Amino acid sequence: MTIYEIKSYLSRPYAEAAFKFANENNIVDDWIYMIEEICKILKNIKIYSLSSFILKKNKNFLFESIKNNFDVYFNNFVKIIIENNRLIIFPEILNQFINLKNDQNNIENITIISKYKLDKKILNKIEKKIKSLIFKEIKINIKIDKSIIGGYIIKSKNFLIDNSIKNKLYRFSEYL
């Protein structure tokens, strides 16, 4: 199991519980904002990377320093995560929470990776094709990666289309 898979596995129950509560109370966007704020705080202090080794008094200090910024329900959520030594997975909780919201709203996040910035016409063609295949609204995130040599990679949580030259060379080398 990769680190990403472990974080994903550990964060899923927290994200699902948080989303269920936020959804039932019509405060999903508020919770996204609060989780984003916690992620920013943790990124700035970088202490969470050793979350299981942080002394209890430091965890309490961290919680006391942030609790006035959030409502009581979110504070309870944060407290549970701190007590279970899971601060390190907060960014993944955010990702999964957003994915749950998008699933509910029938939206698919798509990442398109290419060596160069893609032309608008090409992006529109890709968007139309994907929409016709998955019957969902899509949000496109574009990343530039010079290592793919050429072509593009289209991925979401449900599929991967690797049309990169790097992948084609790799597959060709397997035949040799």
Curated annotation (Swiss-Prot):
InterPro entries: ATP_synth_OSCP/delta_N_sf (IPR026015), ATPase_OSCP/dsu (IPR000711)
Location within or outside the cell: Cell membrane
Main localization category: membrane
Membrane topology annotation: Peripheral membrane protein
Keywords: ATP synthesis, Cell membrane, CF(1), Hydrogen ion transport, Ion transport, Membrane, Transport
SUPFAM superfamilies named among the record's database cross-references: N-terminal domain of the delta subunit of the F1F0-ATP synthase (SSF47928)
A UniProt-annotated Pfam family: OSCP
Cross-referenced Gene3D superfamilies: N-terminal domain of the delta subunit of the F1F0-ATP synthase
One GO cellular component term noted in the UniProt record for this chain: plasma membrane
Superkingdom in the source lineage: Bacteria
GO MF, one example: proton-transporting ATP synthase activity, rotational mechanism
Function field: F(1)F(0) ATP synthase produces ATP from ADP in the presence of a proton or sodium gradient. F-type ATPases consist of two structural domains, F(1) containing the extramembraneous catalytic core and F(0) containing the membrane proton channel, linked together by a central stalk and a peripheral stalk. During catalysis, ATP synthesis in the catalytic domain of F(1) is coupled via a rotary mechanism of the central stalk subunits to proton translocation.
NCBIfam families per record: ATP_synt_delta (TIGR01145), PRK05758.2-2 (NF004402)
Assembly and interaction partners: F-type ATPases have 2 components, F(1) - the catalytic core - and F(0) - the membrane proton channel. F(1) has five subunits: alpha(3), beta(3), gamma(1), delta(1), epsilon(1). F(0) has three main subunits: a(1), b(2) and c(10-14). The alpha and beta chains form an alternating ring which encloses part of the gamma chain. F(1) is attached to F(0) by a central stalk formed by the gamma and epsilon chains, while a peripheral stalk is formed by the delta and b chains.
Family: Belongs to the ATPase delta chain family.
Name listed for the protein in its UniProt record: ATP synthase subunit delta
Native organism: Wigglesworthia glossinidia brevipalpis
Record lineage: Bacteria, Pseudomonadati, Pseudomonadota, Gammaproteobacteria, Enterobacterales
